[in-house]
Structure formats: structure tokens, C-alpha cells
Regions:
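Conserved Rossmann-like nucleotide-binding pocket used by diverse enzymes
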Residues: 6, 24, 52
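A short acidic, Gly/Pro-enriched loop at the edge of an enzyme's catalytic core
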Residues: 11-23
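A short, conserved alpha-helix within the catalytic core of class I
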Residues: 31-41
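Class I SAM-dependent methyltransferase SAM/SAH-binding core
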Residues: 1-13
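A short beta-strand submotif of the Rossmann-like class I SAM-dependent methyltransferase core
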Residues: 22-26, 34
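Conserved Class I S-adenosyl-L-methionine
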Residues: 89-175
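Active-site micro-motifs of SAM-dependent methyltransferase domains
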Residues: 10-12, 30, 58
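Conserved catalytic/acceptor-binding region of the Class I
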Residues: 42, 46-112
Length: 175
């Protein structure tokens, strides 16, 4: 199978009309320019095409290890806005109403297995640390986070997350 890798803003990725059966967006949906994207997706999806949106987050108000990790993130990055997640539906901007109909929506809990090392890696990769801090700050955070995990977490554990999924079907007759 030949797969072409393309790095481009979703709103103007160049594909012929009616190319895809399904387009997915996982974790990135809030960052799009929705007025542009809704129309563009409608164009590149086949006549019975779907747009699936997924989001997943740990629940620090219900999971002690996640809460302690977030507390440490906030010590290093007090301006981080990705904290204190709670279960919520994916908000779909009105721009999609003209082009799509809601077909399915689900919200559910999932216990995600981690080791101390994999949880440290997951936290280090979050935008509050890996995308925001200097290399020296990341190293200091990681040292402190690993020490914290030694104190509060067994070698293997689960972190409570919620997942939200929406599937929208392309409206006919607008091409």
C-alpha cells in the first residue's frame, strides 16, 4: 500500500472532491478554523462520507495519581490551561450544521493502563510540559515527577479517563 504523507493545515489540504469515505480528528478539533474546515470537509468527503471527532482526557478530580501529576505540572507551568478536565460532550460549532448531520455521539469512561515510566512519558508529552517548557525545565520536571510516582504509584496502575466520540454524516446535495 502506498501512502503519501502530507503536512498541511486541515482547512486547505489539497485533495480532489469526494476523495475520502471518512475523515477523523482526534484531540485536535478545538484548534481548527471551523468556518473553513466544515465546507472543505464536505467537499473532500464522498457522498455518504463521515467526519468522526474523538477526544480523550484523564480525570484528575477522580484519579489521585492524575491529580498529583497535574499539581506538579502547575508548579512548573502555572499558566497551563489543560488541567482539571471533567467529562464533557464535544462542542460542535454551528459552522458544521449546513454541511453535516449528527449520526452518533458517545461519552464513556475508560481505565487506561500505565507503568510509572509510561505515565511519566505521557505527562512529559502534554502541552503543559513538553510543548511549553525549556529543556532544562523539562529535565527538572521529569526528575521530580519520577520521584513523585515512586512515592504515590505502584509500578503498574490505571488512570481514569473519559472518551467522547461524535460521528457526523455529510449532507447530500451541496456539492
Amino acid at each position: 500500500m502506498e501512502i503519501t504523507f502530507l503536512c498541511a493545515p486541515a482547512e486547505n489540504a489539497q485533495f480532489p472532491g469526494q476523495t475520502f469515505d471518512v475523515v477523523t480528528a482526534c484531540q485536535c478539533f478545538p484548534y481548527f478554523r471551523h468556518e473553513e474546515l466544515a465546507k472543505h470537509l464536505h467537499t473532500i468527503l464522498k457522498s455518504d462520507g463521515r467526519f468522526a471527532i474523538m477526544y480523550m482526557a484523564w480525570l484528575p478530580l477522580e484519579d489521585r495519581i492524575a491529580a498529583k501529576s497535574e499539581e506538579l505540572i502547575l508548579q512548573y507551568n502555572p499558566d497551563w490551561t489543560g488541567c482539571n478536565e471533567v467529562r464533557r460532550r464535544i462542542g460542535i460549532p454551528d459552522a458544521y450544521d449546513a454541511y453535516f448531520t449528527l449520526e452518533e455521539e458517545e461519552l464513556f469512561d475508560i481505565a487506561v493502563p500505565f507503568t510509572r515510566d509510561s505515565w511519566n512519558g505521557r505527562i512529559k508529552a502534554c502541552r503543559g510540559i513538553g510543548a511549553s517548557l525549556s529543556e532544562a525545565e523539562i529535565e527538572a520536571f521529569e526528575k521530580e515527577h519520577r520521584s513523585l510516582l515512586q512515592q504515590i504509584a505502584p509500578e503498574e496502575f490505571e488512570i481514569l479517563h473519559y472518551a467522547a466520540i461524535i460521528v457526523m454524516r455529510k449532507k447530500p446535495g451541496l456539492d
